[in-house]
Amino acid sequence: MQKINIRGIEHYYEWVRQPDSTTPKPVMVFVHGWGGSARYWESTAAALAEDFDCLLYDLRGFGRSLITESVEGELSYELEEYADDLALLLDKLELEKVYLNGHSMGASVATFFINRYPERVEKVILTCSGIFEYDEKAFAAFYKFGGYVVKFRYNWFLKVPFADKLFMARFLRRSLPSQISKAFLEDFLLADYEAALGTIFTSVSKKAVEVMPQEFAKITVPTLLVAGEYDQIIPAAMGREAASLSDRVEYFEIAETAHFPMLEDAPTYLQKIKDFVGVS
């Protein structure tokens, strides 16, 4: 297991690339979403490995990038800080310029990154991203529910028949193989409490409502925003509205998919990515 220290946290990372390749390839970095890990990007990365060296990593507090007590409380869970974590990761791996693909919360991190470090990105894919309006009552209810979801997590959930399917139902239009659904549930149960709760408040907040439209409007890097037609987490309309704020953003919607279009309809997703980045 490869790890690299970023601001006191041992971050898990892995390379997905063709083992027999001797020719240097451009690097594509994948950023996962809330409660997940780099694991769900592995099949997408493997499919792109002919044209890219793919770098996957677990965000601070998620997956295999565990937060130790010695640094807990020293770092915030603002998404801008996660963007800075990514910059430090690239520095340590001596990567000057990359392609970037972020999903959900990871897409918000990627958006902050390309505006803070535009010179470090060739092109970016934002998978399931968008902007939303502030509703005080709805947000308060969401925080309360989110707090319960994060607080009451037990490993015995993994032993409950079909728990993984129930957990993933809201995220999907098309079902996924059981081993993938179980991996999602495992990652959710593994997430650090403070990180999981903290990023709920920074991802869905009055500040995010005000800041994210400005961030989309500032985009100068060539960007593809991919939405799932039936996404209930970040509805396609929110992605369409976000894309309209910058002429550098191309919008693409995948039919009959929800919050994980790269897994629900991999052929369509991969073909669009390849067309966008200019590979066969």
Predicted feature descriptions by range:
Residues 136-137, 156-217:
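Conserved alpha/beta-hydrolase catalytic His-Asp/Glu region
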Residues 230-234:
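Acidic catalytic loop of the alpha/beta-hydrolase fold
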Residues 257-270:
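Catalytic histidine-centered segment of alpha/beta-hydrolase-like enzymes
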Residues 56-101, 105, 271:
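Active-site loop/oxyanion-hole signature of alpha/beta-hydrolase fold enzymes
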Residues 1-29, 49-52, 91, 95-96, ...:
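Alpha/beta-hydrolase fold catalytic core
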Residues 115, 123-155:
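Flexible "cap/lid" loop of the alpha/beta hydrolase fold
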Residues 15-68:
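Conserved HGGG/HGGXW glycine-rich cap/lid loop of the alpha/beta-hydrolase fold
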Residues 219, 225-227:
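Short beta-strand/loop motif that positions the catalytic acidic residue
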